[in-house]
A protein has these predicted regions:
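Anion-recognition interface
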Residues: 1-226
Length: 226
Protein backbone atom coordinates (compact mmCIF):
# COMPACT_ATOMS: atom_id res chain seq x y z
CA UNK A 1 0.00 0.00 0.00
CA UNK A 2 2.82 2.41 0.84
CA UNK A 3 4.48 1.92 -2.54
CA UNK A 4 1.16 2.11 -4.35
CA UNK A 5 0.27 5.47 -2.81
CA UNK A 6 3.86 6.78 -2.75
CA UNK A 7 4.26 7.39 0.97
CA UNK A 8 6.95 6.31 3.39
CA UNK A 9 6.39 4.23 6.51
CA UNK A 10 8.38 5.02 9.66
CA UNK A 11 8.27 2.75 12.70
CA UNK A 12 8.99 4.16 16.16
CA UNK A 13 10.07 1.52 18.66
CA UNK A 14 10.56 2.22 22.36
CA UNK A 15 12.83 -0.21 24.16
CA UNK A 16 13.26 -0.50 27.91
CA UNK A 17 16.12 -1.99 29.87
CA UNK A 18 15.24 -5.65 30.12
CA UNK A 19 15.11 -5.93 33.91
CA UNK A 20 12.54 -3.13 34.06
CA UNK A 21 10.44 -4.71 31.34
CA UNK A 22 10.52 -8.05 33.16
CA UNK A 23 8.78 -6.74 36.26
CA UNK A 24 6.40 -4.53 34.27
CA UNK A 25 5.40 -7.36 31.95
CA UNK A 26 4.79 -9.85 34.75
CA UNK A 27 2.84 -7.22 36.67
CA UNK A 28 0.51 -6.84 33.70
CA UNK A 29 0.02 -10.60 33.45
CA UNK A 30 -0.84 -10.81 37.14
CA UNK A 31 -3.24 -7.86 36.89
CA UNK A 32 -5.08 -9.42 33.96
CA UNK A 33 -5.53 -12.50 36.10
CA UNK A 34 -6.70 -15.03 33.52
CA UNK A 35 -3.60 -16.08 31.55
CA UNK A 36 -1.06 -18.82 32.26
CA UNK A 37 1.47 -16.34 33.68
CA UNK A 38 -0.98 -14.80 36.17
CA UNK A 39 0.09 -17.18 38.95
CA UNK A 40 3.79 -17.69 38.23
CA UNK A 41 6.21 -16.80 41.03
CA UNK A 42 8.67 -13.97 40.43
CA UNK A 43 11.75 -16.11 41.10
CA UNK A 44 10.61 -18.71 38.58
CA UNK A 45 9.80 -16.08 36.00
CA UNK A 46 13.06 -14.16 36.15
CA UNK A 47 15.08 -17.38 35.85
CA UNK A 48 13.12 -18.49 32.79
CA UNK A 49 11.40 -15.63 31.03
CA UNK A 50 9.21 -17.84 28.85
CA UNK A 51 7.69 -16.16 25.80
CA UNK A 52 8.53 -12.56 26.59
CA UNK A 53 10.62 -10.87 23.90
CA UNK A 54 13.71 -9.43 25.57
CA UNK A 55 15.98 -9.81 22.56
CA UNK A 56 15.05 -6.50 20.98
CA UNK A 57 17.60 -6.82 18.21
CA UNK A 58 15.92 -9.84 16.64
CA UNK A 59 12.56 -8.10 16.88
CA UNK A 60 13.94 -4.98 15.19
CA UNK A 61 15.50 -7.07 12.45
CA UNK A 62 12.13 -8.68 11.70
CA UNK A 63 10.59 -5.24 11.33
CA UNK A 64 13.54 -4.11 9.21
CA UNK A 65 12.91 -6.94 6.76
CA UNK A 66 9.71 -5.11 5.85
CA UNK A 67 10.59 -1.44 6.33
CA UNK A 68 14.38 -1.31 6.13
CA UNK A 69 16.58 -0.28 9.07
CA UNK A 70 16.64 3.32 7.89
CA UNK A 71 12.90 3.59 8.55
CA UNK A 72 13.03 2.40 12.15
CA UNK A 73 13.38 5.03 14.86
CA UNK A 74 14.61 3.50 18.12
CA UNK A 75 13.91 5.43 21.34
CA UNK A 76 14.96 4.51 24.85
CA UNK A 77 12.15 4.15 27.38
CA UNK A 78 13.91 5.83 30.29
CA UNK A 79 12.68 8.94 32.08
CA UNK A 80 16.25 10.21 32.29
CA UNK A 81 16.59 10.06 28.49
CA UNK A 82 13.25 11.41 27.32
CA UNK A 83 13.70 14.40 25.04
CA UNK A 84 11.53 17.34 24.10
CA UNK A 85 9.90 20.19 25.97
CA UNK A 86 9.38 18.62 29.40
CA UNK A 87 11.30 15.32 29.06
CA UNK A 88 8.27 13.02 29.23
CA UNK A 89 7.22 10.11 27.03
CA UNK A 90 4.75 12.47 25.36
CA UNK A 91 7.28 15.16 24.45
CA UNK A 92 9.79 12.49 23.41
CA UNK A 93 7.33 10.87 21.02
CA UNK A 94 6.34 14.19 19.48
CA UNK A 95 9.99 15.06 18.92
CA UNK A 96 10.51 11.67 17.26
CA UNK A 97 7.78 12.45 14.71
CA UNK A 98 8.84 16.07 14.29
CA UNK A 99 5.85 17.73 15.96
CA UNK A 100 6.18 20.67 18.36
CA UNK A 101 4.83 20.02 21.86
CA UNK A 102 2.57 23.03 22.28
CA UNK A 103 -0.08 23.96 24.85
CA UNK A 104 -2.67 22.56 22.45
CA UNK A 105 -1.76 19.09 23.71
CA UNK A 106 -3.60 18.17 26.91
CA UNK A 107 -2.37 15.22 28.94
CA UNK A 108 -5.32 14.06 31.03
CA UNK A 109 -3.74 11.11 32.84
CA UNK A 110 0.01 10.70 32.94
CA UNK A 111 0.34 7.29 34.64
CA UNK A 112 -2.80 5.27 34.13
CA UNK A 113 -1.20 1.84 34.32
CA UNK A 114 1.21 1.81 37.24
CA UNK A 115 2.95 -1.52 37.77
CA UNK A 116 2.49 -3.70 40.81
CA UNK A 117 5.73 -4.55 42.58
CA UNK A 118 6.82 -6.90 45.32
CA UNK A 119 4.09 -7.49 47.88
CA UNK A 120 1.11 -6.19 45.92
CA UNK A 121 2.08 -8.33 42.94
CA UNK A 122 2.65 -11.40 45.12
CA UNK A 123 -0.67 -11.01 46.97
CA UNK A 124 -2.64 -10.69 43.74
CA UNK A 125 -0.70 -13.59 42.18
CA UNK A 126 -1.83 -15.89 44.99
CA UNK A 127 -5.41 -14.59 44.92
CA UNK A 128 -5.45 -15.32 41.17
CA UNK A 129 -5.20 -19.04 41.95
CA UNK A 130 -8.72 -19.01 43.46
CA UNK A 131 -10.44 -16.31 41.41
CA UNK A 132 -13.64 -17.23 39.56
CA UNK A 133 -14.14 -16.38 35.91
CA UNK A 134 -15.99 -13.19 36.80
CA UNK A 135 -14.87 -9.82 35.43
CA UNK A 136 -16.50 -7.91 38.28
CA UNK A 137 -14.63 -9.89 40.93
CA UNK A 138 -11.35 -9.68 39.04
CA UNK A 139 -11.70 -5.92 38.69
CA UNK A 140 -12.41 -5.54 42.40
CA UNK A 141 -9.33 -7.47 43.55
CA UNK A 142 -7.14 -5.80 40.92
CA UNK A 143 -8.17 -2.37 42.19
CA UNK A 144 -7.50 -3.46 45.78
CA UNK A 145 -4.02 -4.61 44.74
CA UNK A 146 -3.40 -1.28 43.04
CA UNK A 147 -4.44 0.55 46.22
CA UNK A 148 -2.04 -1.69 48.13
CA UNK A 149 0.73 -0.55 45.78
CA UNK A 150 -0.24 3.11 45.86
CA UNK A 151 -0.42 3.37 49.66
CA UNK A 152 2.43 1.12 50.70
CA UNK A 153 4.99 2.25 53.28
CA UNK A 154 7.63 4.57 51.72
CA UNK A 155 10.34 2.29 53.11
CA UNK A 156 8.83 -0.64 51.23
CA UNK A 157 11.10 -0.02 48.26
CA UNK A 158 12.74 -3.37 47.62
CA UNK A 159 14.51 -4.23 44.39
CA UNK A 160 13.49 -7.31 42.42
CA UNK A 161 16.99 -8.40 41.36
CA UNK A 162 20.03 -8.99 43.55
CA UNK A 163 23.29 -7.73 42.08
CA UNK A 164 24.22 -11.25 40.99
CA UNK A 165 20.79 -11.86 39.44
CA UNK A 166 20.88 -8.51 37.67
CA UNK A 167 24.29 -9.15 36.11
CA UNK A 168 23.29 -12.65 35.00
CA UNK A 169 19.94 -11.51 33.60
CA UNK A 170 21.30 -8.52 31.70
CA UNK A 171 24.30 -10.54 30.53
CA UNK A 172 21.96 -12.63 28.37
CA UNK A 173 21.23 -9.60 26.19
CA UNK A 174 24.53 -7.70 26.32
CA UNK A 175 25.72 -8.49 22.79
CA UNK A 176 22.29 -7.81 21.32
CA UNK A 177 22.01 -4.47 23.07
CA UNK A 178 25.45 -3.55 21.76
CA UNK A 179 24.28 -4.45 18.24
CA UNK A 180 21.25 -2.14 18.56
CA UNK A 181 23.44 0.74 19.69
CA UNK A 182 25.74 0.19 16.72
CA UNK A 183 23.31 -0.70 13.93
CA UNK A 184 20.27 1.39 14.83
CA UNK A 185 21.52 4.31 16.93
CA UNK A 186 24.99 4.50 15.36
CA UNK A 187 26.66 5.10 18.70
CA UNK A 188 29.57 3.60 20.59
CA UNK A 189 28.23 4.23 24.09
CA UNK A 190 26.09 1.55 25.77
CA UNK A 191 22.42 1.30 24.86
CA UNK A 192 21.27 1.56 28.48
CA UNK A 193 22.55 3.10 31.68
CA UNK A 194 23.60 -0.07 33.48
CA UNK A 195 23.57 1.33 37.00
CA UNK A 196 21.50 -1.01 39.15
CA UNK A 197 19.06 0.43 41.66
CA UNK A 198 20.48 -0.10 45.13
CA UNK A 199 18.37 -1.66 47.84
CA UNK A 200 17.32 -4.79 49.66
CA UNK A 201 16.23 -7.65 47.43
CA UNK A 202 12.52 -8.43 47.76
CA UNK A 203 11.37 -11.74 49.25
CA UNK A 204 7.82 -12.80 50.25
CA UNK A 205 8.95 -12.97 53.89
CA UNK A 206 9.76 -9.24 54.10
CA UNK A 207 8.70 -7.16 57.11
CA UNK A 208 5.98 -5.23 55.22
CA UNK A 209 4.03 -8.22 53.94
CA UNK A 210 1.69 -8.48 56.94
CA UNK A 211 0.46 -4.89 56.73
CA UNK A 212 0.14 -5.10 52.94
CA UNK A 213 -2.06 -8.19 53.25
CA UNK A 214 -4.28 -6.33 55.73
CA UNK A 215 -4.35 -3.31 53.42
CA UNK A 216 -5.31 -5.44 50.43
CA UNK A 217 -8.18 -7.33 52.08
CA UNK A 218 -9.33 -4.18 53.83
CA UNK A 219 -9.55 -2.59 50.40
CA UNK A 220 -11.59 -5.52 49.09
CA UNK A 221 -14.10 -5.25 51.96
CA UNK A 222 -14.43 -1.47 51.62
CA UNK A 223 -15.01 -1.69 47.87
CA UNK A 224 -17.67 -4.36 48.39
CA UNK A 225 -19.57 -1.99 50.69
CA UNK A 226 -19.72 0.84 48.17
Amino acid sequence: DAKEHDYQVKVIVYIRRQDGLANSWLSQQVKEGWNTNATIKWDSFQRKTRKVVFNYYLLLEKIAEVTGRENIIVRIFDRKKFKGKDHTIFSDFLEAIGVDYTDDFKITEEEANRSLTGNSQEILRIVNTVLPDDDKVRTLVRQAAQDCENYKDPQNNFVMFSEEEFNKFMGRYEKWNEAIAKDYLHQEEPLFDMKRKEGERWTPENRFMYEDIVRFFGGVVIRQQR
